[in-house]
Amino acid sequence: KKNIKVAQKQNLDIQFGHKELLDDFDKVMKCTEERKGISLRTKEYYELLLDTYKDDAFITLAYFHIHDMLNETKERYEKCLLDLDNCPENAKKKRFTLEELKDSLEKKISKYEEDVKTYGETVCVCGTLTVKYGHTSEILYAGMNEDFKRLMGPYLTWYKTMEKCFELGCNTSNMGGIEGTLKGGLVDFKEIYHPRINEYIGEFDIPVNALLYNVAFKFYKKIKERNTKHK
């Protein structure tokens, strides 16, 4: 709840949509691929999902209006300076608090100005792609721009995604898998939603031809390594 409230204070603009949001969703997914050093799916694949599930699939994106936040922070900074000028010298505690606020706002202004130069006035910070089937739904993919991790955007985006699923008539919303050890960042992130964990046996291969399987698996690994190098 704390992280959701942090995200709400950033005035993130949560948008739901379909293929009109695909370009921005693909960008945050590529950010996740780069951060984790993995290969996920292509933009064409996400488009195929949206085409296949039609109205039963949707994208959720969180937009951060950097320029608006910069202007708001500058206004707070000017007020802080005015309060400092009017603060009596003997009001040491209040003066100390205002000095700390002044330093904090200066850092934020500097950061926002840097972000505007890099990303423009508005940037998509994170998103999810969800499909609905029957009375349940599955959050299949989620991505985030690491440069805006401090905004806690994914916490609010996932919450709004699940809220949307329930509005569409779903009884449950599947958040995907977690580490079998019940430890790690993914578990820490998902546990704030108080999920019910369903444990399955997992994925495994049953070779029907041991000789062909060994040859095919080695070939598969080489192709995967080559694709990773050329990505």
Give short role names for the model-derived ranges.
Residues 27-31, 48-56, 70-74, 163, ...:
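Short amphipathic alpha-helical patches
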Residues 6-9, 38-41, 85-88, 154-155, ...:
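Glycine-rich loops and low-complexity Gly/Arg-rich segments
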Residues 1-149:
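A conserved beta-strand-loop-helix scaffold within acyl/acetyltransferase catalytic domains
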Residues 38, 48-49, 83-84, 106, ...:
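Short, intrinsically disordered/low-complexity patches at protein termini
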Residues 11-16, 44-48, 91-93, 158-162, ...:
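Short C-terminal domain-edge/linker segments immediately following a structured domain
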Residues 14-19, 48-54, 97, 165-167, ...:
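Low-complexity, flexible helical/coil segments
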Residues 168-231:
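Active-site/acyl-donor-binding loops of N-acyltransferases
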Residues 120-125, 131-195:
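Acyl-donor binding region in acyl/amide transferases
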